[in-house]
Amino acid sequence: MSEATALSPAEFEQALRAKGAYYHIYHPFHVAMYEGRATREQIQGWVANRFYYQVNIPLKDAAILANCPDREIRREWIQRLLDHDGAPGEDGGIEAWLRLGQAVGLDPDQLRSQELVLPGVRFAVDAYVNFARRANWQEAASSSLTELFAPQIHQSRLDSWPQHYPWIDPAGYEYFRTRLGQARRDVEHGLAITLQHYTTYEGQQRMLEILQFKLDILWSMLDAMSMAYELNRPPYHSVTDQRVWHKGITL
């Protein structure tokens, strides 16, 4: 039985981009935010829970760096850490997200405490970081390729939120504006690594599954938020109105 023929680089890239049909921009929770149907509580809940994702992205990127023996790749990939953590003496994406939190009426200390992070969101983000730690560096790096679709989602927020939510301080949109350029730059690097590494049919199919795994993470995060903030069914809602869920277990 002959082996399946590998996709050409152009065909493989097209298959990767086709996964954009499952990007979380199409999740009902995000659609509601884009269309102006989200409440203040729902937007605050989204900002608070996405903060957990933001603070873990540098850990994901640090894991990739730790597993990567290629000096030139490390030199370029480390920029992602600086984008989020900030270079010495400079703010990064995490501080920009804290300012977004303030813009929607959240206290920075409450965001940092992670007390609002839903278990479903925590589990999804932790799964992503653990994957990056355990996978080979090429697979972990290419799992970031949901960035292919990120500029569209950042632009959609910049286009719609000021119109629909005048109560949000416009200064909070700095994160989205900054990420527009950073995401496009990161896509070029991540896509180059991916197209170079996956040259067999089996490898390409595995990469498509890895990208779907990342899409599942982003979608599942919004599922958890939808349960809590749209359906008013947060964890343990049937037995208490208190946030009794765990706030993170340090190992």
Swiss-Prot record:
SUPFAM superfamilies registered for this protein in UniProt: Heme oxygenase-like
Domain of life: Bacteria
Cross-referenced CDD domains: TenA_PqqC
GO molecular function annotations of the record: pyrroloquinoline-quinone synthase activity
Root EC class: oxidoreductase
Listed Pfam families: TENA_THI-4 (PF03070)
EC number: 1.3.3.11
Substrates-to-products reaction catalysed: 6-(2-amino-2-carboxyethyl)-7,8-dioxo-1,2,3,4,7,8-hexahydroquinoline-2,4-dicarboxylate + 3 O2 = pyrroloquinoline quinone + 2 H2O2 + 2 H2O + H(+)
UniProt keyword Transmembrane, yes or no: no
Annotated metabolic or biological route of this protein: Cofactor biosynthesis; pyrroloquinoline quinone biosynthesis
The keyword Oxidoreductase appears for this protein: yes
Coiled-coil residue windows: none
Entry-linked InterPro entries: Haem_Oase-like_multi-hlx (IPR016084), PqqC (IPR011845), PqqC-like (IPR039068), Thiaminase-2/PQQC (IPR004305)
Gene Ontology biological process terms, A to Z: pyrroloquinoline quinone biosynthetic process; sulfur compound metabolic process
Record key words, sorted: Oxidoreductase, PQQ biosynthesis
Protein family according to the UniProt entry: Belongs to the PqqC family.
General function of this protein: Ring cyclization and eight-electron oxidation of 3a-(2-amino-2-carboxyethyl)-4,5-dioxo-4,5,6,7,8,9-hexahydroquinoline-7,9-dicarboxylic-acid to PQQ.
PANTHER family found in the cross-reference section: 4-AMINOBENZOATE SYNTHASE (PTHR40279:SF3), PQQC-LIKE PROTEIN (PTHR40279)
Family annotation (HAMAP family): PQQ_syn_PqqC (MF_00654)
Protein name: Pyrroloquinoline-quinone synthase
Protein source organism: Pseudomonas syringae pv. syringae (strain B728a)
Encoding gene (name): pqqC
